């Protein structure tokens, strides 16, 4: 027979995790951090697993700068297929 005592715990944990993500998403929105719930979830998981939050923030900023540069190049027609 299956252990049903685990089901409420899993449901409660999932609800709490969603609530935490919602709170972080609200904070992200207020700070104009432009992080969606999925990205926040990944960032939180990385931090919980020992990634330095400041280093993670630096990586996110660098990735955004790189993405902005690629978008600019595409808009100017600089980037071609395969580059």
Curated annotation (Swiss-Prot):
Role, per record: Required for gamma-tubulin complex recruitment to the microtubule organizing center (MTOC).
Organism from which the protein derives: Sclerotinia sclerotiorum (strain ATCC 18683 / 1980 / Ss-1) (White mold)
Transmembrane feature ranges: none
GO cellular component annotations of the record: cytoplasm; gamma-tubulin complex; gamma-tubulin ring complex; interphase microtubule organizing center; mitotic spindle pole body; spindle
Localization: Cytoplasm, Cytoskeleton, Microtubule organizing center, Spindle pole body
Key word Cytoplasm present: yes
A GO biological process held by the record: mitotic spindle assembly
Oligomeric and partner information: Part of the gamma-tubulin complex.
Descriptive protein name: Mitotic-spindle organizing protein 1
Record InterPro entries: MZT1
Main localization (coarse): cytoplasm
Family under the similarity heading: Belongs to the MOZART1 family.
Keywords, alphabetical: Cytoplasm, Cytoskeleton
């Amino acid at each position: 027979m299956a252990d049903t005592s685990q089901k409420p715990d899993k449901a409660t944990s999932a609800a709490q995790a969603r609530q935490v993500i919602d709170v972080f998403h609200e904070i992200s929105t207020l700070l104009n951090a432009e992080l969606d719930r999925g990205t926040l979830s990944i960032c939180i998981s990385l931090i919980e697993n020992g990634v330095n939050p400041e280093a993670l923030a630096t990586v996110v900023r660098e990735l955004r700068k790189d993405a902005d540069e690629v978008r600019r190049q595409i808009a100017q027609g600089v980037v071609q297929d395969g580059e």
